[in-house]
Curated annotation (Swiss-Prot):
Classification of source organism: Bacteria, Bacillati, Mycoplasmatota, Mollicutes, Mycoplasmataceae
Binding locations of GTP: 29-36, 56-60, 75-78, 142-145, 174-176
Name the record gives this protein: Probable GTP-binding protein EngB
PANTHER family, A to Z: ENGB-TYPE G DOMAIN-CONTAINING PROTEIN, MSS1/TRME-RELATED GTP-BINDING PROTEIN
Species for this entry: Mycoplasma capricolum subsp. capricolum (strain California kid / ATCC 27343 / NCTC 10154)
Pfam families registered for this protein in UniProt: MMR_HSR1
Function according to Swiss-Prot or TrEMBL: Necessary for normal cell division and for the maintenance of normal septation.
Example GO BP: division septum assembly
Length: 196
């Protein structure tokens, strides 16, 4: 469970990362996938992560302290927004590559995918990148409340096929609106952190 959560800092590059040994779970996904809402649902704080009406605007890693230093959630910029300049996309890719490959604190990644849609090329590349570097990853399927049962069963299969899903990974369907499976996400965080 998350009993306490607070924003610590935003970092545009490695020099601004927090230098300690506290474990981190990174959250990443396309712009407007529901990442900020997911953080707010996890922490039971609707004001913690700002929900932007301007997708693709944030180019910073946002660090959140959980349970007074037990671990951190790291909110990565949303990717795949067409109106962002190519130079910013390249800067984002370099920053995330550096973070994912070299960040010793990183224990795993929650990759958020919209259950309503086929994964984009960016989604597929992100998942395969994480697998290539042996970074533990959990797929979080968002916006469950927007689909009927027969739709989300069919769409989960479609998403898994599109990203070439590895069976050893966890795939969980959530709704930020009605908190479906949010408790299960705490279990997956503990699993990534190495807790029993």
């Amino acid at each position: 469970m998350i009993k306490q959560a607070s924003f610590i800092t935003s970092a545009a590059n490695k020099s601004n990362w927090i230098n300690d040994d506290v474990s981190e779970i990174c959250l990443i996904g396309r712009s407007n996938v529901g990442k900020s809402s997911f953080i707010n649902s996890l922490t039971n704080n609707n004001k913690l992560a700002k929900i932007s009406n301007t997708p693709g605007k944030t180019r910073l890693l946002n660090f959140f302290e959980i349970n007074k230093g037990e671990y951190r959630l790291v909110d990565a910029p949303g990717y795949g927004y067409a109106k962002v300049d190519d130079s910013i996309k390249i800067q984002f890719a370099k920053m995330m590559e550096e973070y994912f490959i070299n960040r010793k604190n990183l224990k795993g990644v929650f990759l958020l995918l919209d259950l309503r849609h086929k994964p984009s090329n960016d989604d597929i590349m992100m998942y395969q990148f994480l697998k290539h570097y042996n970074i533990p990853v959990v797929i979080i399927g968002t916006k469950l409340d927007k689909l009927k049962k027969n739709e989300y069963i069919k769409n989960e299969k479609m998403i898994k096929e599109a990203i070439n899903f590895y069976q050893e990974d966890d795939f969980i369907k959530i709704s930020n609106l009605n908190k479906t499976n949010i408790i299960k996400c705490y279990e997956l965080i503990n699993k990534l952190l190495g807790s029993k």
